[in-house]
Structures are given as C-alpha cells and as structure tokens.
C-alpha cells in the first residue's frame, strides 16, 4: 500500500521493499514459520497474482493510475488500468480474471466485470473531507470464490461500533 511507504513519493525501483507492510509481512512470516497451517506470499513487486481454484486475482494498490473525480467517476481510470494490466500480464503468459484494488477507498463489487475495489476500514477522514470525496461508511469487500464458477457471492463487511453509534 501507499500509506505505509517510507518516502513521501512512491518509488519505482524496489517499491515493495520501501514499505512497512512488506517489512511487517516478513517479520510475521519469520515468527510463524513453524506453523505449517499458515503460508505467506509476499511479492517483491507492486502486484501479486493469486490463483484461487480456477480464478486468478491480480492484487494491486491501484495508485498507478490517476483520475476518478470527474463526471465518469472511478470507472474510466479503473477500466483503463485493468485493460493495460491485463494486456501486459497476458503478453507474459499470466492473464488474470479479476483485478482487486484499494487506493480509492470506495467499495465496488463488480467481479462479473473483472473488478473489485475495496472500501476503507477507517472510513471518512480529514483528507477525504478537504478533498471533497464522497462519504462512504467504513467497509471492506467480502466474496466467495468456488471452483469452475469463480466469484459467486459478494457482500460488504460493514465496520462499526453498534453501541457507540446507537444502532
């Protein structure tokens, strides 16, 4: 992700390593190496291809593209980025089915269109308010992937405190 990077601007070379998430993942892998129930896939690149049954997911932060605040919303930059990444990965013999991104902190569950955009656990903050981003409640993407049919069910995981929020 870009929130835990060590530099103000993202790097191109060794970008994954210039990040506290990468460091933490390696520390956890070391700590849990004797537990054979847990495996780690810690990519050295900004993207990770993850096969689940017959479906291949491309996990990427999503900050490699710009835009999303115009009249077309997030769709034009997301679809451009997906098309470019799919073309690149397919040319290397590694096509993917669904691209999963975060970056915009807006939940879009469109697996049938090859796209899942994750929401944000923390919800709205000062940056979102001063940037005039639309309000979105804290939420995360949840889906079920099955053999042969891929993603068959999707739902938001709504994050909140029922008691303090009174619901």
Walk through the language-model features, giving the residues of each.
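Catalytic cores of extracellular degradative/oxidative enzymes
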Residues: 2-13, 48
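Conserved beta-sheet core of the metallophosphoesterase superfamily
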Residues: 14-46, 51-159
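Long, compositionally biased intrinsically disordered regions
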Residues: 166-167
């Amino acid at each position: 992700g870009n929130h835990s990077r060590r530099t103000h601007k993202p790097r191109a070379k060794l970008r994954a390593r210039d990040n506290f998430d990468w460091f933490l993942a390696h520390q956890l892998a070391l700590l849990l190496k004797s537990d054979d129930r847990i495996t780690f896939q810690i990519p050295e690149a900004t993207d990770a291809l993850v096969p689940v049954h017959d479906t291949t997911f491309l996990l990427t932060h999503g900050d490699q593209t710009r835009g999303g605040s115009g009249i077309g919303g997030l769709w034009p930059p997301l679809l451009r980025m997906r098309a470019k990444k799919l073309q690149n990965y397919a040319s290397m013999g590694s096509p993917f089915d669904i691209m999963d991104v975060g970056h915009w902190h807006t939940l879009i569950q469109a697996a049938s269109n090859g796209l899942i955009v994750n929401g944000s656990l923390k919800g709205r903050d000062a940056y979102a308010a001063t940037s005039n981003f639309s309000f979105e409640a804290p939420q995360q993407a949840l889906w079920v992937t099955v053999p042969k049919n891929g993603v068959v069910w999707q739902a938001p995981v709504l994050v909140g405190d029922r008691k303090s929020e009174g619901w």
